[in-house]
Amino acid sequence: MAKFEFGGPPRFAHQKRGLAKLIACNGVGALLMEPGTGKTAVTLDYCSLLALASPRREARVLVIGPLAAVDQWALQAQKWVSPQVNVWAEALGGSVMQRVEALRSRGGKEIAKPTGGRGRGSGDEVRALHANRSWALAARRDGIELDRKTAAKAGPDVLGDGKPRLVIEAVNLDTLSQRRQVGSKTMADVVLSAVTDFDPDLVVIDEMHKIKSVSSNASRLAGRIGSRVERRIGLTGTVIPHSPLDVYGQWRFIDPKAFGRVQPNGERKPATFKAFKEDYAEMGGYMGHEVVGFKNLDRLEEIMGERSSVAIKEECLDLPDAVDTVLPVALSPKELKAYEDMRTKLQVEFREEDDLRADAGSGGGDAATAASRLVRMTRLRQITAGHLPDDEGQVREIGRSKAKTIASLIHDTLEDEKRIVVFGTFTRELAALEEEIADKRTTVLRIDGSTKPEDRLAMRQRFGSDEPARLVIVAQIKTLSVAVNELVTAQNAIFASLPWQRDDIVQARDRLNRLGQKSATTFWYALAPNTVDDIVFQAYQDRTDLEKTLMNHIYADRK
């Protein structure tokens, strides 16, 4: 085999160690790496190796994860997958049954009567069913990115036979939670059958700690899926979010025999939760049925270490001080329609203005016109934030895709973080974020332009204190982007919407990544792909001409 070529930027030392561990464990293991340390890249490296070694010249990978994680696999695959491999990566969309049918289709099974029909933009190829409903889809053939329409119509076979193929299907963890009856079967049975039809070489569970609950539907089905697939990888930075007993449900998927007891004949049986508790929990309390402590934790750690690689951000000395991570947001059909309608409306307005200026013999680059257009283009940012402004100045909610995705990130990926900052722009956006994020174990501190100075100070001081409560600040970016020092207690900040001014973003970042910060920081950017969100973020990164790029976006023909 030719020397392996990594895709994307060079890997850090801890990522290379993680890949070596997965290889040594024959693809049965865990990457216990903190958010922002590059678990996805390591996993895609291993997936690339599977494709290169595949007897059928196609490696199939099923990824299961929470809402905030699944789109990442489609959007990051082209960056990290080896250039020696052609790749198809998809975040399955549609109803649960449509996702199930799509998964079977990717395995080559023909679906006679698809749920909801094939829909607009669907091809007739057997492996392309419901690809038009995917939340995110990316395909790269011979180093060239294929447009989504072409890929969706052909399915994975669009990759051709020139290079080994890597086919990645990512599904929301909720797909495993369904228990309703489907004829004589439960939905869990239907999902399991679909996984079998897809015939994956590897199953990956992203944010694996979400299957820690022993009795949850998702955890039990994950265990059943794991028993049918040769290779299983779990990814999480918080493997023990609450207690060492959280390990059982996760290792039931990875290696159910790891904590099992050896039988008299020398065979090791799969572990039971009862035996696991006996081995690692101190029981007491009422009638001896309450967990009052833990024991044998060195042995627990030793067994976990046999199949895991650990990376702690502040200990990865070759990591940059700050990590930028894009959080893709799949807008709803209603939000997408509102966005395209507004873009078309602005396009008509601007062209009419251009024609009037041309007739008058005046140029089109005056500052007043540019400022006016920038103000009107703010409507596009409001729409990606879930709100639609009308001509009378009234604003109504049209969806919460972004707020729900951010809430999923906070409660799933960042479940173990006690302090998190969310920066937004619009008042209604902040209200939606507050409602989606707040729960019984998370207190939201909301700060906007109307918050009294004394209340702001009190909230900032509370956030900067040693109070054990889990606190999330949701703030308008201009209210906390300067002269604030208390945010260094957080290692994660999420930009729900980005301001036009680059300096506002830089200043907001500096509130966390500054003197007094004891850990590496991660900045998350919630971006709806192919919208104004992408443009503002790219302008921030590249220091490009924002106005010119925005106008190109407005004038571009719809795809």
Model-found features: residue ranges?
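Conserved Helicase C-terminal RecA-like lobe
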Residues: M1-F4, P10, V28, G36-G38, ...
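SF2 helicase motor core recognition
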Residues: S177-R180, H242-P244, L430-E434, R456-L457, ...
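Conserved Walker A/P-loop ATP-binding site and its immediately adjacent core
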Residues: V42, E58-K79, P241, L245-D246, ...
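Inter-lobe coupling linker of SF2 helicases/translocases
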Residues: A170-Q178, V190-D197, S216-E230, G260-V395, ...
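N-terminal pre-P-loop "Q-motif" helix
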Residues: G8-C25, K402
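Conserved helicase motor
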Residues: E90-V100, L173-Q178, K212-S215, G424-R428, ...
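Conserved helix-turn-beta segment of the N-terminal RecA-like "Helicase ATP-binding" lobe
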Residues: V70-A138, G143, K257-A258
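A conserved SF2-helicase RecA2
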Residues: W500-K559
